């Protein structure tokens, strides 16, 4: 940071993709200003978004990414062959300036997600690396992502697990291989996640909690905050996260039946799942509005106007959402498994 005449420590902050712009991405972005004051920061990603580009420009931070944003391969065969890891590694290799940024830096702070772990193939063994492992790969180590939005299996779960054995082994090898490096550390985002990391990978992990900037979700609405968001005509609750069985979206609608409360769903989902949810909500006489991508100001307004922020998610720590809800004075009702 230049204090006492010393050169700032070089830090590469990396995440495979920011496309989702969910809690993990928002958490990392809200920490960049503080990191930039302490370190000489470069940001690397295979899929930037306009919000990240604007922030890096404002902070004077170098943003490294491929010319064409990377998308993880889709389809059952890609999952079985673990094609995403190889595809991401090739995309990292195509990032102009990445090699120089790593060579000129002292530390890599890597946040897990699609495409992230493949960066380790381009980081020297001797370099200090901190991995913020937000959760063990749930598609490989659990069956919750292999169920439809209503909980029914997408295909035979035993066969799915067997077909993913190669990808599962490779995931474990990557994580354990990182711990074998002489200058490495792994943190979960909660004590729950740290425990799961121990169960899945057989290693110890620290805890790096998520953070909220008070100005982003203030107790009182700022002049820039919209008075309302969406077209909800009556009382509503908010759920956050991509519509899926693991997020408990289906059960949230069931819970609201007969309550007179509508549901605002933030986080999107695939078209088929959203159509099924809309049909199910109609059958339960529950109003459902699927919100588009929202800014922090819009999220604050939406939460502020809600009766509660709710979640029926399976096997997840509470994360950022309840902290954001509490910050604006709205109750957060989350299932405790």
Set out the residue ranges of the language-model regions.
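Glycosyltransferase donor-sugar binding loop
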Residues: 45-50, 240, 261-277, 292
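Short hydrophobic beta-strand element within catalytic cores of glycosyltransferases
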Residues: 331-336
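Aromatic "clamp/platform" in nucleotide-sugar-dependent glycosyltransferases that forms part
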Residues: 314
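A conserved mid-protein helix/loop that constitutes part of the nucleotide-sugar donor-binding site
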Residues: 26-30, 235, 242-258
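Acidic anion/phosphate-binding donor-loop and adjacent secondary structure
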Residues: 2, 195, 199-200, 212-234
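Nucleotide-activated donor-binding/catalytic signature segment of Leloir-type glycosyltransferases, i.e.
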Residues: 275-297
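Short alpha-helical donor nucleotide-sugar binding micro-motif in glycosyltransferases
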Residues: 293, 301-306
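Membrane-proximal helix-turn-helix segments that form the acceptor-binding/catalytic region
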Residues: 99, 137, 148-186, 193-195
